[in-house]
Amino acid sequence: MFRSLGLFLRYLDLAYPARPADYSGYRAALAAKLREPGRMAEFLKTFKSTPADAEKQLPHIRCPALVLMGTADPDFAGPQAEGDAIVAAMPGGAGTVAMVDGAGHYPHAQSPEAVAELVIPFLKEHAGA
């Protein structure tokens, strides 16, 4: 997918439509870390699995799962539809979709407060499940 750090950083800019105030510092620190010897090669290994690999595992989920998606995620033509499809592939009742308005591919980093407002009630509801 990404053959170079430059390509990944350009993608990262697209993946963050709602940028936190510290985005430029975060981006610079991430770039510096990926420039360390061997880091980029290890990072690229994370892209060796495919969506099909993950999809095969969805029917085996046996605990409550929160599928958290940003409404502006550039990786999907329809983030809501993608989340719905993921949940539909899980055993009945296992999955819940939650959308973070205006967030891209990294809602936890772009909108941490909004993510917390979705995750904390989910965890409280399913504690001990």
Describe each region flagged by the PLM:
Residues 56, 71, 128-129:
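Charged, solvent-exposed alpha-helical segments that act as regulatory interaction surfaces
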